[in-house]
């Protein structure tokens, strides 16, 4: 659901760029100014600026900002190591942690009146899912070679006609389940908030749903990251 955001529209209009909530053309520049892309740039800028200003110079005795980031980053690092092993966690921490922070903020930004969540677009969630899906196959092939794909045909040759279609459907279903789960939940939150804002004003009536929206936003980010970790660990262990 696309809410009008005046200051972004004004800035882009003054720069001669397509307004994100107006008609969007077919050129590359116009595509980059579509609503979900505009808010993606906004989320990325927010994460960069917040980390820059809250961290500053790292100190031996950390301040409040450094303590906050050490808690978040340290917690994710321990979780990844417990579920994937230390070596694999170190290798994929930048990617998965970036996904976690991006998805959490992208989900939450839609709770601000006049903003929308980039993850309320299937384009965003499918792009994230494709990266995860492709990476977990790369991990499996790198760890086990062609033997990684033997689980698609089952342990016995006579089971191939049965196991191959089942395994292929199951594997490609991950693309749908991971992307549509995130998209569907966040889109439902956006639609419900939009209806309540329109019917009951900007503050009191939507407040309970906004509180629930915070929980949904964080839980969906956690679910996406958890499943990513599980897929990567399975690919490494060759256990499906």
Swiss-Prot record:
Keyword entries, A-Z: ATP synthesis, Cell inner membrane, Cell membrane, CF(0), Hydrogen ion transport, Ion transport, Membrane, Transmembrane, Transmembrane helix, Transport
Predominant localisation class: membrane
N-terminal signal peptide: none
The organism's place on the tree of life at top rank: Bacteria
GO molecular function: proton-transporting ATP synthase activity, rotational mechanism
GO biological process: proton motive force-driven plasma membrane ATP synthesis
Name of one Pfam family that matches: ATP-synt_A
Transmembrane segments: 41-61, 92-112, 121-141, 152-172, 191-211, 212-232
SUPFAM superfamilies in UniProt: F1F0 ATP synthase subunit A
Membrane topology field: Multi-pass membrane protein
Subcellular location(s) per record: Cell inner membrane
GO CC term, one of those recorded: plasma membrane
Functional note: Key component of the proton channel; it plays a direct role in the translocation of protons across the membrane.
Family per similarity comment: Belongs to the ATPase A chain family.
Assembly description: F-type ATPases have 2 components, CF(1) - the catalytic core - and CF(0) - the membrane proton channel. CF(1) has five subunits: alpha(3), beta(3), gamma(1), delta(1), epsilon(1). CF(0) has three main subunits: a(1), b(2) and c(9-12). The alpha and beta chains form an alternating ring which encloses part of the gamma chain. CF(1) is attached to CF(0) by a central stalk formed by the gamma and epsilon chains, while a peripheral stalk is formed by the delta and b chains.
NCBIfam families reported in the protein's UniProt record: ATP_synt_6_or_A (TIGR01131)
The protein, known as: ATP synthase subunit a
Species in which this protein is naturally found: Desulfotalea psychrophila (strain LSv54 / DSM 12343)
């Amino acid at each position: 659901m696309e809410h009008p955001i005046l200051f972004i529209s004004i800035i882009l209009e003054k720069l001669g760029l397509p307004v994100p909530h107006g008609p969007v053309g077919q050129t590359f520049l116009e595509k980059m100014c579509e609503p979900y892309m505009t808010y993606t740039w906004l989320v990325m800028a927010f994460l960069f600026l917040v980390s820059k200003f809250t961290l500053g110079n790292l100190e031996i005795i950390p301040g409040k900002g450094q303590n906050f980031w050490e808690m978040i980053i340290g917690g994710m690092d321990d979780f990844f190591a417990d579920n994937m092993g230390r070596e694999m966690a170190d290798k994929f921490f930048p990617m998965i942690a970036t996904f976690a922070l991006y998805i959490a903020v992208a989900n939450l930004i839609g709770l601000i009146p006049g903003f929308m969540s980039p993850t309320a677009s299937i384009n965003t969630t499918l792009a994230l899912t494709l990266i995860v899906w492709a990476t977990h196959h790369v991990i499996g092939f790198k760890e086990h070679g062609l033997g990684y794909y033997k689980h698609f045909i089952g342990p016995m040759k006579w089971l191939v006609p049965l196991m191959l279609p089942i395994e292929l459907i199951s594997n490609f279903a991950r693309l749908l389940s991971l992307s549509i789960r995130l998209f569907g939940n966040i889109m439902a939150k956006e639609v419900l908030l939009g209806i309540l804002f329109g019917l009951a004003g900007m503050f009191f009536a939507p407040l309970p749903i906004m509180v629930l929206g915070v929980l949904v936003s964080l839980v969906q980010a956690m679910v996406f990251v958890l499943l990513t970790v599980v897929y990567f660990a399975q690919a490494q262990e060759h256990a499906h």
